[in-house]
Amino acid sequence: MIIYTTLPQDTLYKIANKYGTTISAIVGANAISNPDKLAIGQNLIIPVDNIKHIAKRGDTLYNISKYYDVPLDKIIEANPDITNPNNIYIGQAIYVPYGITPSRSAEINGYAIANISQRTISQIVPSLTYMAIFSYQVRADGSMYTLYEQNVINEARANTVAPLMVITNIGESGGFDSDLGHTILNDESVQNTLINNILSTLQNKNYYGVDVDFEFLYPEDREAYIAFLRKLKDAISPYGYTLSVAVAPKYRDNQPGILYEAHDYYAIGQIADRVIIMTYEWGYVYGAPQAIAPYNEVREVISYAVTRIAPNKILMGVPNYAYDWTLPFNTGDSAETLTNNQAIDRAIQYGANIEWDDKAKSPYYNYIDNNGKTHVVWFEDARSYQAKTDIVRDYNLAGMSIWTVNNYFAPLYGVINNNFDVIRVIE
């Protein structure tokens, strides 16, 4: 696999011919909606392991390496019969390696809204370890709202993907509710009821474990939250169920803000089997335009996290969506949420050139809509996902967690499968 950035006048025919593959292979690897139209700057997965370049007049290994964007030492390594790299002849076959041998195994979690389609499930299960089904919303009395997800659980298990039950403190208004969290965390009777309901659901619905996603907890509930997690772990562990906990992305222990203060990385890391760090939403619906998961910010969070949590417990969050902001942005404005496929198609629709922010390692573009309004779109693509896998490797993390898997984006799974051997925890 290589990642190719399209140039003006590029066509799939030209690209396929250059790399010795087929148009249909490129279309499939990228789920391209219209093979006749590409955006300038679009990052495409080219599904090839290596190609054979026939040397012509003026060729050098250096020029060949630049043409194919493959390091010179890799080309030399792939051609042991070349005794003098400075001396190649016309007509000589030069093998250019593109294959990535997965350097390590990894766990991949995918958050799935319960209405995920059967087709999408079949597309994503080869690349997942866990499927965390979102979500059981808890009530103030310890009961939970009903979730109709048995078919998703069954499909996950049928494809050796471990289903996780997700519980949240999402209130009746549809947002994370601090007061609801406070009630649950400070009433032992309510906790006992909730834990019994969780255990019953795990058993009756054939879940593998539970994921706790309590957000916007009051800072004063920090210790109560840890006590609840410990109590939950003690209740489910004897039955073989696992506990994962989703936490906000922090840079330091004492980071202020209701999103962060109740999430004690060290204490949670001691209790949970896995910690899912939600490293996304720097750019968010109601915020100013920016990358959703900037590489530099994500890396800073992970560099702190591994000092508090065992790296082999950490699943680093990656977003699978895009935002479109109307400019100029004013406080109170909201962005339109898109899928990554929609973001790329919109760039093509308006003839926008896709740009690359090297600090954030994220793609974006500007366009003018039919009403004359200027927009900026930030999204994820093969190149940005590839950069994120470097963080997983560099810090030796357990793996990655996708929010969400409901909208299939082929390049995400291509990057995962070319970088990692996906671990299975059930048969």
Region spans (language model):
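Substrate-binding cleft and catalytic face of glycoside hydrolase catalytic domains
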Residues: 94, 151-189, 197-205, 209, ...
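Glycan-recognition patch characteristic of GH18 chitinases/ENGases
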Residues: 99-192
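Short, acidic/polar
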Residues: 112-127, 188-203, 257-266, 380-393
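Conserved, mostly hydrophobic/aromatic
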Residues: 131, 212, 275, 316, ...
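Glycan-binding loop/region signatures in secreted carbohydrate-active enzymes
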Residues: 166-181, 320-388, 418-427
